[in-house]
Amino acid sequence: MSMTTPIVDFVRSYAQSGTARLHMPGHKGQSLLGFEPLDITEIRGADELYAPEGIIAESEANATRLFGTAHSYYSTEGSSQCIRAMLFLALQGAPQSGKRPVLLAARNAHKALLYAAALLDFDIRWLWPSAQAEGALCSCPVTAEALTGALHALAQQGISPFGVYVTSPDYLGGVQDIPALAAVCRAQGVPLLVDNAHGAYLRFLPLNCHPIAQGAAMCCDSAHKTLPVVTGGAYLHLGHNAPVQDEAAVRGALALFGSTSPSYLILQSLDACNAVLAGDYPRRLAQCCAALEGLRRSLNKAAAVRQCPVPLAVAGTQQEPMKLTLDAAALGCTGTVLAEALRCAQMECEYADPRYVVLMFTPENPPQDYTRLQTALEQLLAAVPAGLPCPENRAGEFAALQQQAVQRCTIRQAVLGAQVRVPVHKALGRVCAMPTVSCPPAIPVAVSGEEITPAAIALMQRYGIEELSVLR
């Protein structure tokens, strides 16, 4: 498929024109780091991100065709901007009841959701992981039955949520059953909103499993996480079932949460990516996923030979194909120890916690990256002692967190209130102010406005959180 790159073409032409730059930015195209000649602002012909009529409009139309959406909008400020805009639009599109707006959301949400709740002043009712789920901060699998039950429970309280919000894929690579959740939302007349920050590439697999294709009303993609796009490049995708379709309203929502000086370096990267996606990238993507599946099988076969208590590589139909998530319990160590061992072998992971290590691959990783990783892990497997115990199921910790959770004030009141930092061990009974998270994965243990409970303190200490902000 042939694909134009109008933003790239315009900026390159301007950079080569010799025009005197009597406008921002202050570097005037003079190279300090090398990219400055291509770094421009919204001059004549460069279009305007939040009111495009020219090259940006053309480029976004290209992205819309590639993703098969009703409309795909660019963001130069990551999925965080898109999440806020998406929630703003869902609020705008919801029937006005005169009551406080409520969002039904899976608990493993990024802190951007809490910031949006503070800014837009809505409440959140949480979907928690089931008692059968493996306990992990990053995971919250939601079944269609659980969602149906939660919606019915809210209806009995006279609450009609303005949206259902899930994160899929999550930080450990787990994916929700989006078609089943979308069917429930469609039957209940509630839009399904998906934080698909880690799944932009899903559209380009042999079997399209992008959230919009599977029935979500809106979703955000961090292009920079899994596609060849520089940091900050993202999309807000609308399906044909999105509650708001008016283009001006969507751009207004993005502008509300975005800078008036969008990066043209990021816009060029998004534009250039269209041509890549229209070329042989899907083929290379399939090859990458196949190589990772082969690596998973090889590692798990080696782990079985060593009689490890669990598979080394997390696998299954509910795992996305382009993350390699390692269960350090297979080696008898913590995820942070395993990450340090890989670091000593000149490999930097995406994320590590007490149990897991997350490694992110794309088609841009050369073959030697796979070889280096496999060699290092096989050496670690060879040193595994016999008779390692099975890891403890930590689901009870999250069940306790759910049972003890009490919301003492709204998220907005907590985030905007007077705050003080205290050690975690002195926070019992205080009210969480700003969410205390590590980044990655930026998922809060205690939510703003919640009382700090014994279960919350235990989890914070397990995940290495030493201080948090509480209301004075």
Which positions does each model-derived feature cover?
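Generic beta-strand/beta-sheet core signal
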Residues: 106, 127, 167, 195, ...
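Conserved N-terminal alpha-helix of the aminotransferase class I/II PLP-enzyme fold
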Residues: 36-81
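Conserved C-terminal alpha-helix-loop-beta "cap" of PLP-dependent enzymes
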Residues: 300, 304-448, 454, 459-463
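Terminal helix/beta-alpha structural elements that buttress the NAD(P)+-binding lobe
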Residues: 467
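Short active-site oxyanion
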Residues: 70-72, 99-103, 445
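Short, glycine-/Ser/Thr-/acidic-enriched flexible segments
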Residues: 29, 171, 225-226, 241-243, ...
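N-terminal "arm"/small-domain region of PLP-dependent enzymes with the aminotransferase-like
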Residues: 1-54, 190
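Conserved PLP-enzyme active-site core in the AAT-like
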Residues: 3-12, 78-311
